[in-house]
Structure formats: C-alpha cells, structure tokens
Swiss-Prot record:
It comes from Severe acute respiratory syndrome coronavirus (SARS-CoV). This is Membrane protein. Pfam families: CoV_M. The keyword RNA-binding does not apply. Changing residue 73 to T: In strain: Isolate TC3. It is a multi-pass membrane protein. One of its GO terms (cellular component) is host cell Golgi membrane. Changing residue 27 to C: In strain: Isolate CUHK-Su10, Isolate TWC2, Isolate TWC3, Isolate TWH, Isolate TWJ, Isolate TWK, Isolate TWS, Isolate TWY, Isolate Taiwan TC1, Isolate Taiwan TC2 and Isolate Taiwan TC3. CDD domains: SARS-like-CoV_M. GO terms for molecular function: identical protein binding; structural constituent of virion. Component of the viral envelope that plays a central role in virus morphogenesis and assembly via its interactions with other viral proteins.
Length: 221
C-alpha cells in the first residue's frame, strides 16, 4: 500500500486475481436472476430475486445515510441527504401501494416489488392470484391436456366448461373486470378462451365464495 493510504496497481491486480472466481460466481448468479427469474418460469429463482429486490431498498437507503454522516465535503453530504430522502420516499410509496393492493386482494403477491398488477381467477371455490407485468384489454386462457394457463401462469387443472365467467385484474387504485367471451374446445381436454375487459373502478376483491353469485367484487367505501 502506498504511503498516502491508497493501493498500487500491482496490489489491485493481486486482489483481482484472488477474487476472480468469486466475482465470476456473483456475475453468474446475477445473469441467472435476470434471465430466468420470472414468476411463470422458475418460481424458486423468482422468489430469490424478490428477496434481493426487497433487501436493496434498505441497503441503498443505509448507504446514502452513511454517506451523509461520513461526508467527504458539504457538496457530497448534500447530495447524499437528497438521495436518502428520495429513496425513503420511493420506499414509502412502495409500502403504501402494496398495502392498498393487499386491502383490495388479500394476497401476499401485493408486496411484490416488481409489479403492482395482480390477476385474480376464481377456481374451485378459491381465488388464484398471480402477478402481471401490465393490464391488457383482452386476456387469453389456454387449456392444454386439462391444465389451465393464463398470461403465462399455470393455474391448475380445469375443463373448458368450468372456466369462470368473470376474472379480475387489480392494481393499488383500480379493479378491472373481465368477462368470458369466445371459447372453443379442442379435443377432449384442451381448448382456449378469451376474457374481455368490460368494467373498471375502485373496487375490492370479495374473497368469500360461499355464495353462488358471479359478482366477486364489492365497492370500496
């Protein structure tokens, strides 16, 4: 190490040579998360990515707070304070939106840091909830050998005649209704259908399916 406390080029090369393997594994893990960690592909990697995203918020906030406390000068200190306030407000807005979505759907997917759009499909007396990246005007349903898929998500076994008449897509501010449109059976246990959006408003999902009516949402008061 140099007299002024900095490291030399040779010392930097030695550090890189010693940590090359670890750095390679870290980059490989990052590539796997970016390329394969999707909710409709690999649920295990997707959960790891969500945990990583959750941890990034407090770690980033702590970095800016420490940069403000142990500032190099007043300029960097001011920038650190401003960035800490911005990150804190962004983190707070995430929690506000997540709790509003949870109040609407009662699903733990509401705290997904990647998206605040949830697909809700009533099947066999329960509501199956999965995350969506965007809200579409039309949502397709495909049944392949008795297994239902919507928006790339596998939702379980279902026959074409047992498809729900209505599904919903929830955000922190709205609940959109989709009604079953055209459907077509293909073979004995396959088929496809389309759901068209016909209503949108400030509703919350009714998770009580004890009744037999098809209206699965109540207006938020």
């Amino acid at each position: 190490m140099a007299d002024n406390g900095t490291i030399t080029v040779e010392e930097l090369k030695q550090l890189l040579e010693q940590w090359n393997l670890v750095i390679g594994f870290l980059f490989l893990a990052w590539i796997m998360l970016l390329q394969f960690a999707y909710s409709n592909r690999n649920r295990f990697l997707y959960i790891i990515k969500l945990v990583f995203l959750w941890l990034l918020w407090p770690v980033t906030l702590a970095c800016f707070v420490l940069a403000a406390v142990y500032r190099i000068n007043w300029v960097t200190g001011g920038i650190a304070i401003a960035m800490a306030c911005i990150v804190g407000l962004m983190w707070l807005s995430y929690f506000v939106a997540s709790f509003r979505l949870f109040a609407r759907t009662r699903s733990m997917w509401s705290f997904n840091p990647e998206t605040n759009i949830l697909l809700n499909v009533p099947l066999r007396g329960t509501i199956v909830t999965r995350p969506l990246m965007e809200s579409e005007l039309v949502i397709g349903a495909v049944i392949i050998r008795g297994h239902l898929r919507m928006a790339g998500h596998s939702l379980g076994r279902c026959d074409i005649k047992d498809l729900p008449k209505e599904i919903t897509v929830a955000t922190s501010r709205t609940l959109s209704y989709y009604k079953l449109g055209a459907s077509q059976r293909v073979g004995t246990d396959s088929g496809f259908a389309a759901y068209n959006r016909y209503r949108i408003g400030n509703y919350k999902l009714n998770t009580d399916h004890a009744g037999s009516n098809d209206n699965i949402a109540l207006l938020v008061q």
